[in-house]
Amino acid sequence: MKKAVILFNLGGPDSLSAVRPFLFNLFYDKRIINLPNPFRFLLAKFISKRRESTAQEIYEHIGGKSPILENTKAQADALELKLNENGNHVYKIFICMRYWHPFADEVVKSVKQFDPDEIILLPLYPQYSTTTTLSSIENWQKNAKLECNTKTIHHYYDNEDFIEAHVNLTSKYYKLASKIGKPRVLFSAHSLPLSIIKKGDPYASQIEKTVKLIVKKLNIEDLDWGICYQSKVGPVKWLEPSTESELSRAKDDNIPVVLSPISFVSEHSETLVELDIEYKAIIKDGYYFRVPTLSTDLLFIKCLADLCLDHSQSTDL
């Protein structure tokens, strides 16, 4: 059988000139700003124009573009290799970005040419949210219209290999930080407006469950740890505490910090600029230890492969 795996991710501008249209696509998503048109269209135009220069400055720090597509391609290559190890089926990975190329309508054409017997939808969002997972799946379904058996993986926040991969990386950096003093481990996730959480979005509760499983598996006596949220935009109330405020508190306590980006699985502007430049500057020199994202970690790729294999043999979850 031929099986297509669609890897969903956010996407990112591939040049400085792409920043404004990328931002427009982001804020025009009804799962991000829930307003009827023409108000959502006008607001997306306004926000993308207003934030363009600030966002461009961010991307200038990392070569004038987002590395997310390149990093996702590396994950796709590793996953395709893993899935095709036994040779029972032919798996082909397709990358589908939400707010910049390759868009769903472009990917659908490639999938049709492949002509799979089965399609597996795999968001690169470990924790489910209507703003990420659901938005990507809805957008795919709107564009795909394929008569093909389709399975959807909604989340994997508690997957054993996913947790173990985080434990291994966090433990490594904890040991490094321990040479200075007793570290505080901060698990940083992308924040969301509280209004979305109050409508029943499970994202925050799944973040908490992920972190508690990691902490339990770390098995470090009297571990000092906390959950914090980054990347807030706008004046409304978001999930707290903020990563910035927690880093400031750690600075006041004069302790080393191990920071793990718990909701991101690849490096992009929120990790390479926000965490590695802006937030790092808060902490005393030599006291900041940033755990890398899972990227192509062998256990993480195994996690994704097993999810695909399990869903191929089961009903849609």
UniProtKB/Swiss-Prot annotation:
Reactions performed catalytically: heme b + 2 H(+) = protoporphyrin IX + Fe(2+)
Q: Which gene encodes it?
A: hemH
Q: What is this protein called?
A: Ferrochelatase
Main localization category: cytoplasm
Organism phylogeny: Bacteria, Pseudomonadati, Pseudomonadota, Alphaproteobacteria, Rickettsiales
Q: What class of enzyme is it?
A: lyase
The UniProt keywords, alphabetically, are: Cytoplasm, Heme biosynthesis, Iron, Lyase, Metal-binding, Porphyrin biosynthesis
The record's annotation in Pfam families points to: Ferrochelatase
The pathway is: Porphyrin-containing compound metabolism; protoheme biosynthesis; protoheme from protoporphyrin-IX: step 1/1
